[in-house]
Amino acid sequence: MLSNEKDYLLNPPLSLLGPEPWDLDVNTFHKGLQRRKSEPIKEALLDQTLISGLGNIYDDEVLFATKINPKMEANLISLKQAEAIKKESIRILREAIKNGGSTIRSYHPKEGVSGMMQNELLAYGKGNTPCSRCGFPLRKISIGGRGTVYCPICQHIEGKPLIVGVTGPIASGKSSVSTYLESNGYQKIDADAIVSSLYMESDVKNGLSSLFGEEAIKDGNVDRDYLSKVLLDGANKEKLDSFIHPLVYKRIEEEINNSKAKRIVIDVPLLIDSPLEEICDLIIYVEANEKTQIARLVERGKDPKTSLAINSGFPRGKAKKKAGIVIDANYDINHLKKELESYDFLLDK
């Protein structure tokens, strides 16, 4: 189908585009958001039939400027917030046009021209860097299949807790970090404690018995020593993880949903790439060298060789990359506390 400059906007797919920010009727826009129940506002803004001209980069910038959390449900956006979205969309797009657009990786607005707007971006592409307003590490998550960056403090959803996830390999010092945060006003949710609780439940015992034989249960209790031996087989470890992890994640989510705390720390060894990763506002990765791990395992009465072998698959590199804070826990507790105290934004003052 051929079109001319007068009617090209009347034919699909261009005819399906929503108004650009300059032409946006706020009341109509707000009503459109009201119909999008349970859909995150970031995902709604990516829909070009609702508002066109933004895209992933400028959606992050607009939400950062308006202090709206990208995970907030679109139907909960107020008329005042809808007005702010329009205002900031216009301002940011004008600034982008003035600066020639954003040059991200291999994208160029036209041959031989590089946009300078990327130098003005405050959110997009800046995951785990300090927020320009409050200093808290910006968080990168995925919404609608698109990378999304926001500030957990400046874009906090009223009535929702700040969730800090602590992760790291075995005997790295995770518990010391989460216990410190607990002493500073956080509610602590410990995945290992939840596993111990689950191991007391009949259904879980029956499941373990089915997976690993009757030897998995001794005198009515889960035989952890036996499990440690069978888990040296990678296939058996995968079986246990597939069985127990969904139960742990569900229990943690239930505790979070039932909590009235303003700040929650979840201590989860296998946090990375789990369903819990996306709900965390900050990830703290705790690392320790093998010498330190062995010393701590011996102190706990554990066999270092077996324990380290079972946990050899921990994704250290990926966890470190995704963390907003990396803690070196090779030293004593006083050194650890000083390191944590250097992050003022962690403390609920």
Name every feature range the model reports, one short phrase each.
Residues M1-A65, E73:
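Phosphate/anion-contacting hairpin/loop surfaces
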Residues C131-C134, C151-C154:
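Short cysteine-rich clusters marking metal-coordination/redox-active sites
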Residues V164-V166:
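Hydrophobic anchor at the beta1->P-loop junction of P-loop NTPases
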Residues S172:
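ATP-binding Walker
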Residues S175:
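Walker A/P-loop
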Residues A193, S197-K262:
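ATP-dependent small-molecule kinase phosphotransfer cores
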Residues R251-N257, R263-E299:
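ATP-dependent NMP and nucleoside kinases share a basic, alpha-helical "lid"
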Residues I252, K260, E277-I279, E299-L347:
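Small-molecule kinase domains that catalyze NTP-dependent phosphoryl transfer to phosphate-bearing small molecules
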